[in-house]
C-alpha cells in the first residue's frame, strides 16, 4: 500500500492561552508589553504569499491588537501601510512600523484622533501623499469602556467618545478616502459579535457595532457600480490591550466562547487579508464572523 505523509493538524482549542488569566489592570489605552499572556500578532508565524503585492493600505488603530496584526499581515502580503495611533500609543506604533519595515514595505505612522473630521481629512491627504493613492481602507479603530453599573453610569462624555470614534470616524474616513480609491479597491470595517449579541455592560459600544454592520451592507450596494467592495469582520473576544484597560475582570475573558478561549489578534488578520485580496472579488456586503463558534446571523 502507498504510504501517505501525515498531515499536521492544529487543534484550535489549545492553540493559544486559555483562561483563567492573571489579574491585571491597566489604564486606557493599555499596553501590549504589560499584558499576561502577551498577545500574538503573527510575528513568528504569519507567512505572506504576495496576495496584496503593491497595494496601498490605510489602517486605523494599527498600533496594537487587531490593527497591528492586520498591518503586519498586509505588509507580509506585499502592501505598503499608513496606520493611525493616538499620541499616548507612540511606543506601540513604533513596534508596528518596525514589523512593517521588516517585511520590506513602507510604514507611515500617523497621530490621528478620528473623532475630528479635519484630522480624518488630513489623514487621507497624508496617506495619498505618502503612497500615491489608497487601495485598501481598514476602519478598525474603536473605543469601549465597560460600565457594569448600568446606563446611569454612562456619561455623555463617554457616549460621545464611543460614537465619534466608532461611527463618525469611520464615516468621515470612508467619505474622504473614496475619492482616491480606484476600481478593485476595498473597504473593510471592524464590527463585532457585540453587534449581534450585545453585552449589557457594553451598551454604547454594542450600539455602534450593530450600526457598522448596517453601514457595511449599505455601502457595498452604493459602491458596487464603482467596482469597490465593502465588507466587515465581526470578531468575538480577542485578547488585546483594550481588555485589561476597559474590562472590570479580564481573568475569565473569552471563556464563554465555544472554543473556551479568546482569539489572538493573529487569528483575525487572515480574514482581512482575504477580503482585501482578489480572491474575494465576488464578495461584497458581507460580514465575516470570527467568533470561535458563537453563532451569529
Where are these regions (language model features)?
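Residue(s) in the substrate-gating loop at a strand-loop-helix junction
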Residues: 192
Amino acid at each position: 500500500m502507498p504510504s501517505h505523509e501525515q498531515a499536521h493538524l492544529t487543534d484550535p482549542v489549545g492553540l493559544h492561552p486559555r483562561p483563567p488569566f492573571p489579574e491585571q489592570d491597566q489604564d486606557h489605552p493599555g499596553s501590549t508589553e504589560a499584558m499576561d499572556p502577551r498577545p500574538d500578532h503573527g510575528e513568528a508565524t504569519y507567512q505572506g504569499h504576495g496576495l496584496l503585492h503593491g497595494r496601498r493600505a490605510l489602517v486605523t488603530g494599527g498600533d496594537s491588537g487587531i490593527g497591528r496584526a492586520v498591518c503586519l499581515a498586509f505588509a507580509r502580503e506585499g502592501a505598503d501601510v499608513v496606520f493611525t495611533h493616538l499620541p499616548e500609543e507612540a511606543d506601540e506604533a513604533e513596534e508596528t512600523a518596525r514589523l512593517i519595515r521588516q517585511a520590506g514595505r513602507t510604514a507611515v505612522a500617523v497621530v490621528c484622533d478620528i473623532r475630528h473630521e479635519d484630522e480624518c481629512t488630513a489623514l487621507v491627504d497624508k496617506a495619498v501623499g505618502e503612497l500615491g493613492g489608497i487601495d485598501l481602507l481598514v476602519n478598525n479603530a474603536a473605543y469601549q469602556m465597560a460600565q457594569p453599573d448600568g446606563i446611569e453610569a454612562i456619561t455623555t462624555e463617554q457616549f460621545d467618545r464611543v460614537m465619534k470614534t466608532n461611527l463618525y470616524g469611520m464615516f468621515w474616513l470612508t467619505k474622504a478616502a473614496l475619492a482616491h480609491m480606484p476600481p478593485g479597491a476595498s473597504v473593510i470595517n471592524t464590527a463585532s459579535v457585540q453587534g449581534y449579541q450585545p453585552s449589557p455592560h457594553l451598551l454604547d459600544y454594542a450600539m455602534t457595532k450593530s450600526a457598522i454592520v448596517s453601514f457595511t451592507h449599505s455601502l457595498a450596494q452604493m459602491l458596487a457600480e464603482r467596482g469597490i467592495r465593502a465588507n466587515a469582520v465581526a470578531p468575538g473576544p480577542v485578547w488585546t490591550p483594550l481588555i485589561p484597560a476597559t474590562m472590570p475582570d479580564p481573568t475569565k475573558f473569552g471563556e464563554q466562547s465555544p472554543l473556551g478561549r479568546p482569539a489572538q489578534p493573529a487569528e483575525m488578520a487572515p480574514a482581512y487579508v482575504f477580503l482585501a485580496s482578489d480572491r474575494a472579488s465576488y464578495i461584497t456586503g458581507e460580514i465575516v464572523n470570527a467568533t470561535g463558534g458563537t453563532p451569529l446571523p
